[in-house]
Amino acid sequence: MDNRGEFLNNVAQALGRPLRLEPQAEDAPLNNYANERLTQLNQQQRCDAFIQFASDVMLTRCELTSEAKAAEAAIRLCKELGDQSVVISGDTRLEELGISERLQQECNAVVWDPAKGAENISQAEQAKVGVVYAEYGLTESGGVVLFSAAERGRSLSLLPEYSLFILRKSTILPRVAQLAEKLHQKAQAGERMPSCINIISGPSSTADIELIKVVGVHGPVKAVYLIIEDC
């Protein structure tokens, strides 16, 4: 017996079992929670659970609206939060909902323009409210998912004091596993991946110091979800 065999034999004896030279199949997992948790919920139940978690745990304000009333709801919320300075993502989906145009009319909002370069960041830094379109909501965490692009800068949801996220009810997913699957499908289809994928769960929240909870140390002080009931 060579040194390797002798060593392995000693290990096997210490474990109280015969020497194994071939790998053993792993036991079947007891569950598949990583992929299946919350998938039993229908879309309405997902939305209800999403709102409850976001409101109770993340201290995020949630409102429901229709496509037809989305623009007026966005105006009202921006005015409540502080319409003296509003920046909007250059996302065409906000334009299609009429939100971009109405906020420019009513709140003198500025639209993120890639051609302006660093000026966009300065405007976002001085803004009271940033308005962005969320790709998905995650029921488990109460967070929203943002895909960055030239017309959708990361500063829009980071620098303003308040963030208003426009989210469609139909895009609320059970958890991050389903988000990963959608990204995988995009990659398999040859679609270009976003430069940055942000999962935002409302304002920052920490209780590191003496277990005293402090909200809004970084990121938006307050987040608002405007959920469009499209299903």
Swiss-Prot record:
Give the GO cellular component terms, alphabetically: cytosol
Query: Could you tell me which Pfam families the record lists for this protein?
Result: LUD_dom
Q: Which domain of life is it from?
A: Bacteria
Which GO MF term does the entry hold, naming one?
L-lactate dehydrogenase activity
**SS bond list:** none
- Which Gene3D superfamilies does the entry mention? NagB/RpiA/CoA transferase-like
State the family it belongs to. Answer: Belongs to the LutC/YkgG family.
Q: What else is known?
A: The E.coli ykgEFG operon is a clear homolog of the B.subtilis lutABC operon, however it is not able of restoring L-lactate utilization to the B.subtilis mutant for lutABC operon. Thus, ykgEFG operon may contribute to lactate catabolism in E.coli, but under conditions other than those tested, or alternatively, the ykgEFG operon may be responsible for the catabolism of a metabolite other than (but perhaps related to) lactate in E.coli.
Question: What PANTHER family does this protein map onto?
Answer: LACTATE UTILIZATION PROTEIN C
Supply the name of the protein: Uncharacterized protein YkgG
User: What is the protein's species of origin?
Assistant: Escherichia coli (strain K12)
Gene name on record? ykgG
